[in-house]
Amino acid sequence: MQRQSRITTLLLLAVMTCGVSLAQDTPQTEISRQITCKYEDALAIIEQQVDATKTFDDDARRIEVLVRAADLLWSHKEANARKAYSEAFALAKRHFKEKGEGLEQEGRLSIRGPDHRYVVINSIARHDVNWSKKLVAELLKEQEDEASSKPTKDAQQAERTAERLLTVATSLLSLDEAASLSFARSSLKFPATMFLTEFLYTASAHNKSAADQFYQEALAAYLNAPMERLLYLSAYPFGNNRDAGDMPGHTIYQVPTDFTPNPNLQRLFVQAILQRVQRFIDNPSDVTAGTRIPDPEEMWLALTRLEKQIHKSLPDLAPAVEVARNGVTARLSQESQRELRGRIGSDNPPSRTFDEQVESALKNPNVNTRDHRLTSAVLYSSKNESVDHVLQVVDKISDSNIRQPLLNWFFFDRSQRALKEQKFDDARRLATRVEELDQRAFLYSQIAKEALKRNADQTSAREMLEDIVDAAAKAPNTTVKARALLAVASLYTRIDMNRAVAVMAEAIECVNRIEHADFTRQFVIRKIEGKHFSMYASIVTSGYKPETVLAEIAAVDFDNMLNQASRFSDKSLRAITTLAIAERCLKSARSGSQKGATRPR
């Protein structure tokens, strides 16, 4: 009976039902010494979170909590975990049917949301691959049935399916290589995308021979596909970071540092292109228009861009490549040839200094083009210029709506660069020039983190951390500001646990003031939007989330952090943070023979 009473107390602390928050009181600043973290309690807390999801209004948040809880329960109560996963999958299917993936707007930029069906499948695959495969087969069958009732194919849906399958495959690489490759193979039924090359490079870092073998399977699958799809297989054999064609979607691939190109794969790929060229020459009317340019133009681009590498590694094929390219050229219009040569020329434009770019921009009579070029010069070519010189150029931009976002972007990047060079004073000085206070506070937190890594004395470390709190107090309530405060709380755990708890309380207050606070996205978008051009980049803000910092402090102060988690006004965030604390308890109980979650201070 006593044990049951104690569990009930813990559940009330966690505020598992939709009712009342216990956070009306002043935040605690003293560390509780009570040891109440026990294995059975942690499991009870997790199961209460599953029950609490029934009160959520947002299906996406409900799915997130169910998946997290099921993942934690699997090793302890598999039947309950399966039930939670099944509920999450049913909700995800309903959510997708009603809303699809959904799009979020960042100015003029649209950002696609996650497909929660595959989020659930991804998590299940870590525990039961066969079950996850059955769920994928179920989705693909439904997709096929739906497509058969439509007069035209949904090409975009097919691409997204391939991307989702490859995302699952990538997540499984370190856990179950065979399962990973199985999911990757299932993607070959759908159009190739840049996700395929990204998977190949990631897989090669785990098992190069397996990745090379899968490449051959992919090449066979896409041998007769439109050139803009086949050319997604152009980068991997040569170890290139870009595709050789004009692709529907493109990126710069992260090639593993120790990656070694495979001449055999290079030969197979070049021979495939030569076969396609010959087919075109034999039957010029049998070509695919392509999303951007027709197949023959894609062939010409690929053979031209890979020419030097082919001469170096496959000299015996170089003559055939030259003949093939000439054959394609002869069948292209003069206008197409000019456009293609222009594309090749833009691959490696002549290098111009910052001042040369500025001078050229200022001569342009079109004010919008001039502003665009000046902005580009500041962002991408001013690395070695003095701050004062760059500021003089920014002043020449006509559109006042561009100047301040550009300055924030410039000083943010300069501060980060100084931080990488361990010039902490310069980094702080530059950060003060960032007028977006939440981003300034985030920069301060990164500077403090690096300084503490290098054993800065506690007095200066405390000064830096308090500077962040002061800057955050003046900043608008955003997830960037909240992450900065969370960073301070985390960093304070190294020097002053009481202060860590107090700052954690401030972070929670900040989060509660943010409408629809979402910490699942590990980046924020910064943007410059002129009248006729837009530029976007992401700031990576990963590492500091409410659940991770609360769990970190819970290793010392379980009861207090469980109480702090109850203060979140958002039900799903309250549940996610509580689950993270319970997970910490499970790990501690397992490693410490249920001695609790305290550690020496």
Range-by-range predicted roles:
Residues L22-R601:
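Non-catalytic tandem-repeat scaffold regions and their flanking low-complexity/translocation tails
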Residues M1-S5:
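N-terminal secretory signal peptides that target proteins for export/translocation
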Residues T8-G19:
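Bacterial N-terminal signal peptides
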